[in-house]
């Protein structure tokens, strides 16, 4: 989803120097500093990007003669540029304003340092334009690991999340999980209306932060593991060794998925804690528990053969 110039002005408190056409969309998250273009080099120029002039580009223009500056700026603005932003609160060259006015282009200004401004606006645009989807489930932060709990309605996802919150972990969202793919990472958030709320069957909706404190909720979290609840089946083929990895594709990103069969008497919150701890262990170690068992078996067999 694109962002309009007007939205950008509002969110970054930009000063409007020259207005342009209304509802101009910004459809790419990259930013360009047009130093090479002002020098006359236009190979690989991306005019669809937001153009940002900082101290270096401004000084380059300042050193030009008025005629050369006019020529270079007219050439620059002949391309289909969405907007130009001047950083550091720098003064605007008159030739720049005249060239932009001819093309009816937006000229904006920010007081921020150029590198900091570019970093912030790039992150902002990447977030706004990221592919997005909504899944049914509960997203919690367990030991710093974002865990998406899925399963059919009424199977106990919210109740498990409540138990995890009581044990000191944090809730991101219940029931609806808004997910964005940003640079290969899946970031889950709560819809604004239900942020901080948890629905428990038989009780209704509870305000988690009011009952357990502000430290019990999070605005967003990167999804690392999917925990899928399903009803226990006596003849179910469940992974008992942890060697059969399963993944689920979300917005083109594969996420590890664990199937947890639910039946009375199982402490699901403890299982999820163990899954989070095991995930961290696997990231730090090249040896799995199965490898350790196999090594012990070989050592035991060698000892028996020597007897």
Swiss-Prot record:
ATP binds at residues 151-158. Its cofactor is Mg(2+). Its EC number is 2.7.11.-, 2.7.4.-. The active site is at 136, 157, 175 (proton acceptor), 240. GO terms for molecular function: ATP binding; magnesium ion binding; phosphorelay sensor kinase activity; protein serine/threonine kinase activity; protein serine/threonine/tyrosine kinase activity. GO terms for biological process: regulation of carbohydrate metabolic process. CDD domains: HprK_C. It catalyses: [HPr protein]-L-serine + ATP = [HPr protein]-O-phospho-L-serine + ADP + H(+); [HPr protein]-O-phospho-L-serine + phosphate + H(+) = [HPr protein]-L-serine + diphosphate. Mg(2+) binds at residues 158, 199. Residues 261-266 are annotated as: Important for the catalytic mechanism of dephosphorylation. The keyword ATP-binding applies. It comes from the Bacteria. Keywords: ATP-binding, Carbohydrate metabolism, Kinase, Magnesium, Metal-binding, Multifunctional enzyme, Nucleotide-binding, Serine/threonine-protein kinase, Transferase. SUPFAM superfamilies: HprK N-terminal domain-like, PEP carboxykinase-like. Gene3D superfamilies: HprK N-terminal domain-like (3.40.1390.20), P-loop containing nucleotide triphosphate hydrolases (3.40.50.300). It is an enzyme of class 2 (transferase). Residues 198-207 are annotated as: Important for the catalytic mechanism of both phosphorylation and dephosphorylation. Homohexamer. Catalyzes the ATP- as well as the pyrophosphate-dependent phosphorylation of a specific serine residue in HPr, a phosphocarrier protein of the phosphoenolpyruvate-dependent sugar phosphotransferase system (PTS). HprK/P also catalyzes the pyrophosphate-producing, inorganic phosphate-dependent dephosphorylation (phosphorolysis) of seryl-phosphorylated HPr (P-Ser-HPr). The Walker A ATP-binding motif also binds Pi and PPi. Belongs to the HPrK/P family. Both phosphorylation and phosphorolysis are carried out by the same active site and suggest a common mechanism for both reactions. This is HPr kinase/phosphorylase. It comes from Clostridium perfringens (strain SM101 / Type A). The gene is hprK.
């Amino acid at each position: 989803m694109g962002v309009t110039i007007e939205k950008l002005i509002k969110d970054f408190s930009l000063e409007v120097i020259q207005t342009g056409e209304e509802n101009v969309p910004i459809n790419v998250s990259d930013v360009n500093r047009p130093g090479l273009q002002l020098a006359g080099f236009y190979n690989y120029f991306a005019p669809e990007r937001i153009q940002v002039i900082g101290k270096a580009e401004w000084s380059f223009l300042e050193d030009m003669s008025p005629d050369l500056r006019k020529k270079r700026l007219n050439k620059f603005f002949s391309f289909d540029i969405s907007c130009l932003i001047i950083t550091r609160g720098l003064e605007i060259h008159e030739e720049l304003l005249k060239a932009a006015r001819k093309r009816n282009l937006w000229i904006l200004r920010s007081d921020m340092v150029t590198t900091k401004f570019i970093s912030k606006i790039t992150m902002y645009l990447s977030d706004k334009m990221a592919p997005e989807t909504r899944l049914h489930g509960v997203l919690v932060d367990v030991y710093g690991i974002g865990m998406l709990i899925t399963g059919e309605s009424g199977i106990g996802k919210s109740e498990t999340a409540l138990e995890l919150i009581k044990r000191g972990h944090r809730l991101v969202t219940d029931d609806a999980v808004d997910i964005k793919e940003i640079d290969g990472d899946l970031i889950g958030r709560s819809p604004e209306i239900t942020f901080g709320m948890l629905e428990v069957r038989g009780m209704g909706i509870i305000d988690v932060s009011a009952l357990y404190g502000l430290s019990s909720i999070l605005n967003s979290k990167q999804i690392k593991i999917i925990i899928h609840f399903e009803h226990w089946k006596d003849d179910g083929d469940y992974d008992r060794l942890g060697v059969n990895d399963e993944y689920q594709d979300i917005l083109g990103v594969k996420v590890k998925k664990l199937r947890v069969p639910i039946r009375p008497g199982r402490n699901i919150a403890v299982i999820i804690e163990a899954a989070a701890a095991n995930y961290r262990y696997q990231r730090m170690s090249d040896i799995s528990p199965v490898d350790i068992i196999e090594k012990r078996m070989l050592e035991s067999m060698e000892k028996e053969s020597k007897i």
